[in-house]
Amino acid sequence: MGMRMMFTVFLLVVLTTTVVSFPSDSASDGRDDEAKDERSDIYESKRNGRCCHPACGKYYSCGR
């Protein structure tokens, strides 16, 4: 294979992986909502004075 052919194949691979990765970004919207819900639960439990999450557990008791 010549250099020009190898460069063309490289460009095709880069372009196809870029195009394929865009639709998967929109599929993560639902997962982002779940992550936001978990974070709000952590902050809510902090306001109640108890937290079982490792990030806030050292400051508050777990309450179990």
From Swiss-Prot:
One of its GO terms (cellular component) is host cell postsynaptic membrane. The modification 4-hydroxyproline is found at P54. PROSITE patterns: ALPHA_CONOTOXIN. It is found in: Secreted. Expressed by the venom duct. The keyword Disulfide bond applies. Alpha-conotoxins act on postsynaptic membranes, they bind to the nicotinic acetylcholine receptors (nAChR) and thus inhibit them. CnIA and CnIB block muscular nAChR alpha-1/gamma and alpha-1/delta subunits. This is Alpha-conotoxin CnIA. The lineage of its organism: Eukaryota, Metazoa, Spiralia, Lophotrochozoa, Mollusca.
